């Protein structure tokens, strides 16, 4: 039986691992604390938490739509209904647009796909070598592993750094600009506004989602996920760790200003920076 190592537990990594594990030995490694990649869910208490990565799924291709429909039937996913306020003047609102989310969190797809696969979290890949027909993998936690096959599903800039010695295809020499995102998660006193999300028309704050509206939990507080615009985050992401407090304050103040919700005491505030959040011009190449 051939051994496979999949780096990354996002939708891509989880799907590949799920297909391979039917006839092969498969292990997954991820530097994060849990599965999901850019569909991560930040749990704070029992069922309460924040979708602090991808906010929802809206499948466009026929293949992906069929995949999502199966998960909807299995109740792994559900439709996020409610009042979605559309304030952006550049993007046109699509009335047929459906927002699909995880039943318990947006990492539910990954959790479902890898439920029978051995996963190793807190494991960041640092170096790779190909020795005697085996991939030697050195991780930052001082572990070394060997596998017959290696599959990498992380962002292109990280992939390029690790694999440029091994991949001869011209695509590896290309330059690709990925956008950043700074996400702030807040817990406040309950407001009387029954809103699911805001899509803002602002240079700093792009989006706000009310986690309570996803009907995963009940409590006496409001949980909001705030996401910056890419333009603003691109300028600040390199020093977000040092400036978390200031960046969070800017986004929180913008939220109250733009939403019209009365400013109240912040009971919890978390900040997460996505250096490689998304890419507006992806390669046509889907895999290599």
Task: Tell where the protein language model's regions lie, with residue ranges.
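Glycine-rich FAD pyrophosphate-binding loop
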Residues: 5-9, 18-45
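N-terminal Rossmann-fold NAD(P) dinucleotide-binding loop
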Residues: 13-14
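N-terminal FAD cofactor-binding segment of flavoenzymes
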Residues: 19, 40-85
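Conserved flavin/dinucleotide-binding core of flavoenzymes
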Residues: 34, 220-288
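Short beta-strand to alpha-helix junction loop
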Residues: 56-62, 81, 85, 89-114, ...
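A conserved short coil-to-beta-strand element within the FAD-binding core of flavoproteins
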Residues: 121-136
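Glycine-centered tight beta-turn/hairpin loop motif at sheet-sheet or coil-to-beta transitions
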Residues: 139-142
């Amino acid at each position: 039986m051939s051994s496979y190592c999949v780096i990354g537990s996002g939708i891509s990594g989880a799907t590949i691992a799920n297909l391979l594990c039917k006839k092969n030995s498969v292990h997954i490694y991820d530097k994060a604390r849990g599965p999901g990649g850019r569909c991560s869910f930040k749990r704070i208490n029992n069922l309460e938490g924040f979708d602090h990565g991808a906010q929802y799924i809206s499948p466009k291709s026929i293949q992906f739509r069929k995949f999502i429909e199966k998960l909807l039937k299995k109740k792994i996913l559900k439709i996020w209904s409610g009042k979605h306020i559309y304030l952006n003047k550049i993007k046109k609102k699509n009335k047929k647009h459906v927002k699909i989310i995880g039943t318990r969190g947006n990492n539910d797809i990954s959790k479902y796909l890898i439920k029978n696969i051995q996963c190793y979290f807190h494991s960041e890949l640092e170096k790779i070598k190909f020795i005697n027909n085996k991939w030697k993998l050195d991780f930052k936690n001082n572990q070394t592993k060997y596998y017959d096959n290696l599959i990498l599903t992380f962002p292109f800039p990280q992939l390029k750094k690790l694999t440029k010695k091994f991949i001869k295809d011209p695509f590896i020499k290309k330059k690709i600009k990925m956008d950043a995102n700074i996400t702030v998660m807040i817990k406040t006193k309950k407001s009387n506004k029954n809103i699911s999300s805001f899509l803002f028309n602002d240079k700093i704050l792009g989006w706000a989602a009310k986690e309570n509206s996803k009907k995963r939990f009940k409590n006496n507080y409001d949980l909001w996920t705030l996401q910056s615009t890419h333009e603003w985050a691109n300028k600040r992401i390199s020093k977000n760790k040092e400036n978390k407090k200031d960046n969070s304050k800017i986004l929180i103040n913008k939220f109250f200003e733009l939403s019209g919700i009365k400013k109240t005491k912040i009971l919890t505030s978390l900040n997460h920076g996505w250096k490689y959040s998304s890419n507006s011009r992806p390669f046509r190449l889907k895999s290599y």
